[in-house]
Amino acid sequence: MEHLVLTIDDSRTMRDMLRLTLTGAGFRVVQANDGAHGLEVLEAENPDLVVTDINMPIMDGFGFIEHARRLSAHRVTPILVLTTEANAEKKARARRAGATGWIVKPFNPEKLVTVLRKVAP
């Protein structure tokens, strides 16, 4: 069964790269351009996994994770952070919010796919 992945990033280029990588690995992909849009897609599409950036307009990745974890249907949905941030404080904040893991951009496509398959329900 193909897992459905929600990718959230304000960069169209990054969304395109994620779609290409993940569909090539057999995942189905839905996308959002910020955390607020991500919450709409999360509730409408009910993805199996989420990959989110941190630094985005309207609602950042921390806000998205915190809101997603308040939704009973997504309390345990794996949420990976994919960001240029390497700051230990931000990484700890993401974990406290409920992130499953953290990958720093630029990402290695094979590593991302491996991690997603590992945490997939």
Regions found by a protein language model. Give the residues of each.
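C-terminal output helix
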Residues: F107-L116
